[in-house]
Amino acid sequence: MAWPCITRACCIARFWNQLDKADIAVPLVFTKYSEATEHPGAPPQPPAPPQPGLAPPSRAVAIETQPAQGESDAVARATGPAPGPSGDRETAAAPGRSGLGLGAASGSTSGSGPADSVMRQDYRAWKVQRPEPSCRPRSEYQPSDAPFERETQYQKDFRAWPLPRRGDHPWIPKPVQIPATSQPSPPVLGMPKRRPQSQERGPIQLSADARDPEGAGGAGVPAAGKASGADQRDTRRKAGPAWMVTRTEGHEEKPLPPAQSQTQEGGPAAGKASGADQRDTRRKAGPAWMVTRTEGHEEKPLPPAQSQTQEGGPAAGKASGADQRDTRRKAGPAWMVTRTEGHEETPLPPAQSQTQEGGPAAGKASGADQRDTRRKAGPAWMVTRTEGHEETPLPPAQSQTQEGGPAAGKASGADERDTRRKAGPAWMVRRSEGHEQTTAAHAQGTGPEGGKGRAVADALNRQIREEVTSTVSSSYRNEFRAWTDIKPVKPIKAKPQYKPPDDKMVHETSYSAQFKGEASKPTTADNKVVDRRRIRSLYSEPFKESPKVEKPSVQSSKPKKTSTSQKPLRKAKDKQVASGQAAKKKTTESPSATKPDDKEQSKEMNNKLAEAKESRVKPTSDKNQGPVAKEPHKDQGPVAPGLPKGQGPAVQEPLKDQGPMVPGLPKDQAPVVPGSLKGQSPTAPGPPKDQGAVLLGPMKDLGPVAPASVKDQDHMASELLKNKDSVPLAPAKAQSPLLPEPLKNQSPVVPARAKDQSFPAPAPTPLKDPGPVIPEPEKDGAPMVPERRKDQNASIMASLKNEAPVASESVKNQGLGGPEPAKDTGTDLKGHGSVFVAPVKSQGPVVPEPTKGQDPIIPALAKDQGPILPEPPKNQGPPVVLGPIKNQDPVIPVPLKGQDPVVPAPTKDPGPTAPDPLKSQGPRGPQLPTVSPSPPVMIPTVPHAEYIEGSP
């Protein structure tokens, strides 16, 4: 059902409140059932004859968005101040919303009123506390009454001066025909355009002006006194695009009859005032229309007689000039100002037009005027308009004059001279002059202002010149001067537009209240908690690992126990591993600590060495454990499956992983591994662990590497495990990626193998490290390594598994489970987690540190092996170191993966499984690094099997 039946009464009540506030408009459909039943097909008659115009077009379908007229009233009534915005909005909205323009209260309900229909208006919202109010902030936009201030004070102070354009040579006259259309359409006669009251300078003036048929002219009022002149001057100062300014000037030029047009422009020239006026205007910034309007002469058509005077008015006296001058100063969009000025110029009859344009030519004043104009910045059209005389096309005769005008007299000359100074195309300038120059002859002859204007103009000019010279010595001085004469605008404090809800939002929903999370309560048997705590402290206090280490031993037994379910062997091994791991853990912790600190690494190495010795002893156990671990790990990994299958391989794989480690390690490494592993993880003690750790380390390393490696290794592991010897190639491949990393690990172990491993090519060697490593480790290590490996494998597997899968899942488990793995892994993880962190660091950085990581592993191995290296170094030593570093990085990955795989793969053989786990681990591998650290690897061991198997 696309839309619920929201037209039914039951639903309406429910939905309305929401619908009103919804973000999306629901296509609301209200059906008047009466309509539907009575005459479904027929378009309902417009309900309220009183408002026929507004009546809905036709409700052909008995569906309408809003109630019809009669109803709207009902709506208002019913909706009343419905709760919240919806109510208020509703009343107003109802009418508006409906396409019909019904007034909110169109009248009392008419016959068709809602009385007979079921409409939402008939239903009030339930007053009950309905479902919890939404937590979504309600943003109701409350626009403020005050207009939004679009220009900052700063912008007002520093307005851009238009730059002269290339090719604008004001002194080269260009015939200019401004299309009549350029001006805004004439306002209704006598009707100033509406402007905000605030802007109105003298609303009264306006109307008077506008209406004043005779008087000084249309501009009579402004003309009345100096005021107007000042006004205009100000206006000019006003900033804004020219069109703004012009309008500001208030001469909105509308096309005048030919005769007039001349005069129109002429007016300003009439007197100094006007000149000053214009001068200012020029200064004024803003679009011309703004200024013009500002000037307030919005030209409206005046009766012919007037028109002449209209422009002339300002010229009438200085007063007018002053007036205008002020206007110019006035800020605001031109239309605002103009209106303010109140002279909306209207087209004048032909006779007038001449005068109007002619005016400017009248005297020098005009020239001065123009001079200023020239100074004024802006494209000519801007300026001209600014001047407020929008030139309108003149009849041919005039047009000649227009251009000719300047020639008329000295004034004009001065004018032009100035003009030249003025930047911009001539037409621009001319317009700026605002006198579209009409032939001087014409202008003078016709202009009423002609004769008397002359004397005035001269005086005015003189004055202007003085002013100009004193104030405006260089354009630069003005160009970068802040506009100080702009009256600061009183900042408008806008009402905040977002009204936050009064009541505090309760962010608890009934749902969240119902299902409160319970912190899982740790059980005594729960190693996860302890493990996690250990790991956490490990990270924070890397040096306090020994106590933890010991716990880990216990824990590692437990984690292994976790896997114990899988096999008794596992338990036995677990015990061994536990002991081994305890030692390892110490080592691991060292490694982890080391990871935290490189300093620690030296310590780690020492520990590893010491432990390596211990480990050697333990390795045997490890071996036992190793294999055993392997199995458990296998169990854990794929655990049994993989291991058994993979065990050889697994061993190898771990070997691989640990290959480097194991190879030499197995023997040495076995111990070393233990040591190394220990060093690495706990390393030897719990090779499994250690290896877990180591592997962890690798794993972790692998973790990072593991992603690929794990996968690869997964395969590798699986294949390697499976193929480990046989499949070396495949594993190699798998491993190649993995191996590359593992390879590296092993690479060091088996340099070639590393390569091979890198590439599957030396599958055998690549096998994993185990290939070579295995070869040796297997050989040497085979027993040891294998066991170790196994141990490792197991460990690794366990670890890896744990780590890998664990890392992945185990990671989870580890996170959780790390009981042992956690320990081991925890430690390892720590160590390794650290490894991940530390080993990882060691190994994580593994590549860098892998050396370290392997440091833990190899370093442990290598280092441990360092001493041990001799032997392990063989395979592992050099390779290990080499590869381990590299490989180990990878190897770790491999172990991670490989181990994961190894563990998983070996464990499972989990080639396949491993792969998945690997996959899991692949991702997990990466995670491992992250996760692994937190979850001990070991723990995963037990779950590993599941994880590994399950993870895919």
From Swiss-Prot:
Mod. after translation: Palmitoylated. Probably depalmitoylated by ABHD17A, ABHD17B and ABHD17C. During neuronal polarization, palmitoylation and depalmitoylation cycles regulate MAP6 shuttling between secretory vesicles and microtubules, and its polarized distribution in the axon.
Chain intervals with Pro residues compositional bias: 41-55, 761-775, 903-915
One Gene Ontology term of the molecular function aspect: microtubule binding
Modified residues (Phosphoserine): S98, S185, S207, S590, S681, S736, S951
Entry similarity comment: Belongs to the STOP family.
The protein's role, per its UniProt record: Involved in microtubule stabilization in many cell types, including neuronal cells. Specifically has microtubule cold stabilizing activity. Involved in dendrite morphogenesis and maintenance by regulating lysosomal trafficking via its interaction with TMEM106B. Regulates KIF5A-mediated axonal cargo transport. Regulates axonal growth during neuron polarization.
Sites bearing Phosphotyrosine, chain numbering: Y141
Record-level GO cellular component terms: axon; axon cytoplasm; cis-Golgi network; dendrite; Golgi apparatus; Golgi-associated vesicle; microtubule; neuron projection
Mc- repeat residues: 222-267, 268-313, 314-359, 360-405, 406-451
The organism of origin for this protein: Rattus norvegicus
Subunit field text: Interacts with calmodulin (via C-terminus); the interaction is dependent on Ca(2+). Interacts (via C-terminus) with TMEM106B (via N-terminus). Interacts with ZDHHC13 (via ANK repeats). Interacts with ZDHHC17 (via ANK repeats).
Positions of region (Mn 1): 116-139
Region ranges (Mn 2): 151-174
Tissue: Isoform 1 is specifically expressed in adult brain. Isoform 2 is predominantly expressed in embryonic brain; expression persists at low levels in the adult brain.
Basic and acidic residues composition-biased segments: 119-139, 147-171, 542-551, 595-621, 711-725, 776-792, 821-831
Compartments in which it is found: Cytoplasm, Cytoskeleton; Golgi apparatus; Cell projection, Axon; Cell projection, Dendrite
Ranges for region Mn 3: 473-496
Membrane topology: Lipid-anchor
Effect seen on changing C5G: Loss of palmitoylation. Loss of Golgi and secretory vesicle localization. Loss of axonal polarization. Increased dendrite localization without affecting association with microtubules
Name of protein: Microtubule-associated protein 6
Keywords (A to Z) from UniProt: Calmodulin-binding, Cell projection, Cytoplasm, Cytoplasmic vesicle, Cytoskeleton, Golgi apparatus, Lipoprotein, Membrane, Microtubule, Palmitate, Phosphoprotein, Repeat, Transport
